Amino acid sequence: MSYSQQVNKRRTFAIISHPDAGKTTITEKVLLYGNAIQKAGSVKGKGSQAHAKSDWMEMEKQRGISITTSVMQFPYHDCLVNLLDTPGHEDFSEDTYRTLTAVDSCLMVIDSAKGVEERTIKLMDVTRLRDTPILTFMNKLDRDIRDPMELLDEVESVLKIRCAPITWPIGCGKLFKGVYHLYKDETYLYQSGQGHTIQDVRIVKGLNNADLDRAVGEDLARQLRDELELVKGASNEFDHDLFIRGELTPVFFGTALGNFGVDHFLDGLTQWAPAPQARQADCRLVESAEEKLTGFVFKIQANMDPKHRDRVAFMRIVSGKYEKGMKLKQVRLGKEVVLSDALTFMAGDRSHAEEAYAGDIIGLHNHGTIQIGDTFTQGEDLKFTGIPNFAPELFRRIRLKDPLKQKQLLKGLVQLSEEGAVQVFRPLTNNDLIVGAVGVLQFDVVVSRLKSEYNVEAVYETVNVATARWVECSEAKKLEEFKRKNEQNLALDGGDSLTYIAPTMVNLNLTQERYPDIQFFKTREH
């Protein structure tokens, strides 16, 4: 198979949703269809049942939430699909945001009983930064749901994206009978209690087929025909150009738990979603068709293998082909590295990659030298842009139970901050260590990982910090004066960048007014 054929058959996507909309279940079922797992594990930790394949970190198993972004690759039809699993818990936004920089399309999962929820809105804002194409799955049809037309209206008005229904539900809850495919003129009939394996679904061809009335009952069949009249008049037709531009989303209905409808959106994904896209670097646009390898690191994961204290850097290949043993340049350090043992993933199971192509995600072993945002090339000096650090919204001071372990604590915190689990700030005027996060759960994760991985017991104390901003100034003299006068509110972050830590928002606003020449940033490029 030629290089361009290999690249064109790849689809790299992530699933975005509000917590508990059913994302982990959908991930399971997607892998089942891709033959990656033969029987889907029921997701919440119910002791004896199989754990979901993508939730492999210890704390995730205990809580039944996906904390870290796993990568899973599987074949489907003629495509090779890379699914990046993003943390579903409302606290884990920074990791999730960054993962969205490494995909070419997204599946938005909505709980049909609840509609559009707050976290979905935030994540959609991030996909807008790059106009990522979105597919939508209306989940939980086996429960009582809101009116489907109302759900489409809400997506359009709240998320500012047009909806084009591809399938339409017949009944819901205990009366859920299946879905009708608007473009194939076929009805797929649902049977309950078959969520763990792939079933042969009965198909009725034609909307006016008498078999349909017999299968779902005359009342529901009549209701379906009436609703479809309305849908065809009131909703958008699918338009591929608008989809690619991120302005229109194809909508599928189903139940992930009942394993129904998942294959419909997978068909849509492989048929319509873009193959690996070009990507902007600081000096030029890098096309996926280029044969020289380039890639960027969007995530670092500690200890995927508890037996070894290793860290793995996840790299999205933008162009070219990875081959075992090849030499690459790590642009930030200007040094050459030999990649002899890159990994491919099936969440938590690692296999050594012999080759990988643009669109794929590979894992690089990292002994502390790779950071988020690092670019690797075959010699060219370029840096991919758009991999952000977000200013934390929550802060705690961290204190050791055993003061003699200061060195291990610092090492652990720096490593965890490079990995993006948390941000660390060291005030200029004292020896405090302040930890910043986007969500409360990150604090728990850090303490539990410090204990299990670095053998350090730490506790948190409240600290008088409301927000943080990275500061820069083009004139060194003015920056020095600013530092001298505001020393008590300045800190260095994990990457030694100067940061203003404000006790209140009022303080921040006043400081910004007082120093118009100093720039205050909410995000920082890695």
Curated annotation (Swiss-Prot):
Tell me the compartments it is located in: Cytoplasm
Might you name a Gene Ontology BP term for this protein? Answer: regulation of translational termination
Tell me the keywords, alphabetical order.
Cytoplasm, GTP-binding, Nucleotide-binding, Protein biosynthesis
Is the keyword Secreted in the record?
Answer: no
Q: Does the keyword rRNA processing apply?
A: no
Positions of the tr-type G domain: 8-277
Q: Which GO terms describe its molecular function?
A: GTP binding; GTPase activity; guanosine tetraphosphate binding; translation release factor activity, codon nonspecific; translation release factor activity, codon specific
Tell me the first and last residues of the signal peptide.
Answer: none
Domain of life, per UniProt, equals: Bacteria
Which is a Pfam family this sequence falls into? GTP_EFTU
What name goes with this protein?
Answer: Peptide chain release factor 3
Q: Which organism is it from?
A: Histophilus somni (strain 2336) (Haemophilus somnus)
Gene that encodes the chain: prfC
